[in-house]
């Protein structure tokens, strides 16, 4: 009777162990996907975290959709944005539709001397949810040195996309820690997952928001605070210049209804199942291939914009 050589037995167990490991990983991934996208965590976000929700950039798009969803769940809403007229309009609509108290704070997040006013406006409120949504992008994809009014654009992008997240969190977080509960939703972007050339500064600011969120969650999860980085692909909003929703470019309302169910389940989320699939594809794509595709896409958008501007 012949015996298999020791090496053959070793390789068998290496192969069997590898297959078992991959099968377990695949099973766990499927379970998590079912838990997040089919079951969700509907009940976590609501007034039990605190009476008030604060939403920056809450008069349009994703911010407005979050404000409405939180009001629908019975939370009082503080809207912070630039235009008092828009704030009044959205605030009154929320008040009438959902029968909740609302407040507004009109500030321009491109400036850096606004935070005392915000602090005064939030004073004494039991804030359970903060949505750091305010943001800006480029008018169109462009090479770094050719960005119109470059120095001012750099300052505005950093003030609006980065400084606002840090400073408003600084104002709200102490109260959450004191009460040992709270949720902070920082709206990053899929542009923060992987670099997006021709949107260089925007992409970098959104990567900051993602890293800030991950670190903050690790620092304060033991205090009862859940911090989530929300990283959507394209959503049909004014900022994205998309008017008509599609399957892969949902309306802000559809996106938020999906994303809010991931709170407590994912600290980093694309917020929407189709976007999750897109993220998975991008993550396994060779980097050279990704850059070739995304650079071609950015150049195409740039050329289309410049041709249209030239005609006008």
UniProtKB/Swiss-Prot annotation:
Write down the top EC class of this protein: oxidoreductase
Question: Where is it chiefly localized?
Answer: endoplasmic reticulum
Expressed, tissue-wise, as follows: Expressed in most tissues tested.
E.C. no:
1.1.1.330, 1.1.1.62
Catalytic-site annotation from UniProt: 202
Q: Where NADP(+) is bound, by residue?
A: 50-79
Record bears the keyword Transport: no
Q: Which UniProt keywords apply?
A: Endoplasmic reticulum, Lipid biosynthesis, Lipid metabolism, Membrane, NADP, Oxidoreductase, Steroid biosynthesis, Transmembrane, Transmembrane helix
Binding site residues for substrate: 189
Transmembrane residue ranges: 4-24, 182-202, 269-285
Molecular function GO labels: collagen binding; estradiol 17-beta-dehydrogenase [NAD(P)+] activity; fibronectin binding; heparin binding; very-long-chain 3-oxoacyl-CoA reductase activity
Function text: Catalyzes the second of the four reactions of the long-chain fatty acids elongation cycle. This endoplasmic reticulum-bound enzymatic process, allows the addition of two carbons to the chain of long- and very long-chain fatty acids/VLCFAs per cycle. This enzyme has a 3-ketoacyl-CoA reductase activity, reducing 3-ketoacyl-CoA to 3-hydroxyacyl-CoA, within each cycle of fatty acid elongation. Thereby, it may participate in the production of VLCFAs of different chain lengths that are involved in multiple biological processes as precursors of membrane lipids and lipid mediators.
What is the name attached to this protein's record? Very-long-chain 3-oxoacyl-CoA reductase
